[in-house]
A protein has these predicted regions:
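ATP-dependent phospho-/nucleotidyl transfer catalytic cores
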Residues: 18-22, 43-44, 50-54, 109-125, ...
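All-alpha amphipathic helical-bundle segments outside canonical DNA-binding/catalytic cores
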Residues: 288-300
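Catalytic activation segment of kinase domains across protein kinase-like and atypical kinase folds
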Residues: 202, 216-257
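Active-site activation/catalytic loop segments of kinase-like enzymes and analogous catalytic loops
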Residues: 242-286, 302-321
Length: 359
């Protein structure tokens, strides 16, 4: 570890790195400069997931530099408005160790907290404002210059093709027992092309998207409760704004566990949908085209279906991607997503009216 730390020009000795945070993808540590008491985050990039660390860090540096300039222009604190990458002595955004491990350092954003679950509707609203502001501030960033850090990440037609292959191969002999779920996915095949076709036709613009818009990817100000800074930028890529909106809705607009086995407890919350829509569009609305706003419900439905079919495909393939604690966990996860989708379909007109209300 000392050889790794020596790649940065610290202001004197630093403390021993201590494991920090609850992330599952990258190893993360906190450390402190002893002379200044300034804290930093040291992360090892998971190059199994992110195979192009150069492209990954080029994305992150480009976007965070841009966000800092925007913060200065509006009179906000640029060091709290976004992450700040500490460059190595060689002027690089990460260090490649002798064993091939790739490490990076961020300034620690003080007086902030990361929430793992929605504790109040205000938390969900503040997360919407934070992600909406992320879209607003990056509206004029050239999205086509970003690297695709995980190819086809939110390519729903490709996810469906992968699902179909998992069903056909049926490696674990489980398909016969989940025909109802398989047919639920197949019955919505036409839906999976809606957003991609609009993008291909030039009717929807390519945006800078976060692609993992969960509550725990925001730093909240401990004093004010404000959603301050969007973090975990590894999946920042070109994409559709509706997908970022939709992933938040999928994750947050319900009160159930992700693997709830009692589907009577799984309900899509229109109240939380409206709270999030209000915050998201208040922060980002003027940056979006009318059609982008109209298609936000499609983002919610497609991100939920995409996640559900990925859970079901993993169940059919032997649970090799998503970690499980019991045999049917991925199946329960899939059923939960499908129940949320069915609820959205029943409330489609109401969802559209809520979008119109805040346009």
């Amino acid at each position: 570890m000392n050889k790794i730390l020596a790649a940065w020009a610290w202001n004197g000795p630093v403390s021993e790195p201590i494991a920090y945070g609850e992330g599952h993808i990258n190893q993360m540590y906190a450390l402190t400069e002893q002379a200044t008491q300034k804290r930093y985050i040291l992360q090892k990039i998971n190059t199994d997931t992110f195979k192009d660390p150069d492209g990954l860090m080029e994305n992150i540096c480009g976007v965070t530099d841009f966000l800092r300039e925007k913060a200065k222009q509006r009179g906000a604190d640029p060091e709290r408005a976004t992450l700040h990458v500490a460059l190595t002595k060689a002027g690089k955004p990460y260090y490649k160790a002798a064993d091939g491990g790739c490490w990076r350092v961020y300034d620690f954003v003080e007086n902030t907290v990361c929430l793992q679950q929605v504790q109040s509707s205000e938390d969900f609203y503040q997360s919407a404002v934070a992600f909406g502001n992320f879209q607003h501030q990056l509206a004029d960033y050239p999205a086509n210059t970003l690297h695709e850090t995980i190819p086809h990440f939110h390519d729903t037609p490709k996810r469906f093709a992968d699902f179909q292959r998992a069903v056909a191969e049926d490696r674990m002999g489980r398909a016969a027992q989940v025909q109802r779920e398989i047919e639920f996915v197949r019955a919505r095949e036409a839906d999976y092309h809606v957003m991609v076709d609009l993008l291909t036709a030039g009717k929807l613009p390519l945006r800078v998207t976060h692609n993992d818009t969960k509550l725990n990817n925001i730093l909240f100000d401990k004093t004010t409760g404000e959603g301050l800074c969007v973090i975990d930028l590894d999946t920042v890529m070109p994409g559709l704004a509706a997908n970022d909106f939709g992933d938040s809705i999928r994750f947050g607009a319900n009160h159930c566990a992700e693997d709830e086995s009692d589907l009577s407890k799984v309900n899509f919350s229109m109240e939380l949908f409206e709270i999030y829509t209000k915050g998201f569009l208040q922060a980002a609305g003027e940056a979006f085209t009318p059609l982008e706003k109209q298609t936000l419900p499609w983002g919610a439905k497609l991100m939920t279906m995409e996640c559900g079919m990925r859970f079901l495909a993993d169940y059919l393939e032997g649970d090799h991607y998503f970690h499980i604690n019991y045999e049917t966990q991925n199946l329960n996860r899939a059923r939960t997503q499908f129940k949320l989708t069915a609820d959205m379909e029943k409330s489609w007109d109401v969802m559209q009216k809520i979008i119109e209300k805040y346009c």
